[in-house]
């Protein structure tokens, strides 16, 4: 759903080619959750999907988490994939050229591959060689193991409300 993904014909076509390959050669059913803009771009380009690729509008977050937890492998360009992969112990391939979650990269929570077909397939092969072993796939990223996170966030919001109103919104 990222703009650099859906506005780049080559990235979109490379990704669809990988999905076609995986769905046919690996005999896997693929659930592809697409934002409306991405769906429009697929239609405009006339890109067709095999029958075992199920296209769906975006899921509610709880349904999306359920789907990820029960997937053999998760591909996403989402900014939150690092957290989800770390906390849910997912086999995750991050379809971005870069990411803001450096702490997750330092602890290898995902495999960052961009849209290069060969790199994506290398990541798939890496996970397949684990023979389905999910145990200890990811250790939780240390920065995500904060026991009183909610309390800290409330204190931060309270602390910065006046500052943001004054400096950002000039109220």
Q: How should these model regions be labeled?
A:
Residues 2-171:
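Nucleotide-activated sugar donor-binding and catalytic core shared by glycosyltransferases
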């Amino acid at each position: 759903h990222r703009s650099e993904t859906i506005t780049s014909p080559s990235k979109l076509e490379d990704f669809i080619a990988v999905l076609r390959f995986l769905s046919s050669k690996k005999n896997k059913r693929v659930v592809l959750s697409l934002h409306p803009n991405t769906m429009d771009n697929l239609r405009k380009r006339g890109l067709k999907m095999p029958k075992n690729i199920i296209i769906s509008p975006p899921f509610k977050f709880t349904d999306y988490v359920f789907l990820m937890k029960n997937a053999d492998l998760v591909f996403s360009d989402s900014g939150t994939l690092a957290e989800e992969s770390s906390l849910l112990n997912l086999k995750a391939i991050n379809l971005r050229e870069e990411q803001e979650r450096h702490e997750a990269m330092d602890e290898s929570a995902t495999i960052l591959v961009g849209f290069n077909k060969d790199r994506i397939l290398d990541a798939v092969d890496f996970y397949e060689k684990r023979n389905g072993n999910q145990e200890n796939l990811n250790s939780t990223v240390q920065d995500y193991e904060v026991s009183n996170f909610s309390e800290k966030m409330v204190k931060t919001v309270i602390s910065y409300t006046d500052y943001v109103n004054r400096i950002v919104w000039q109220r």
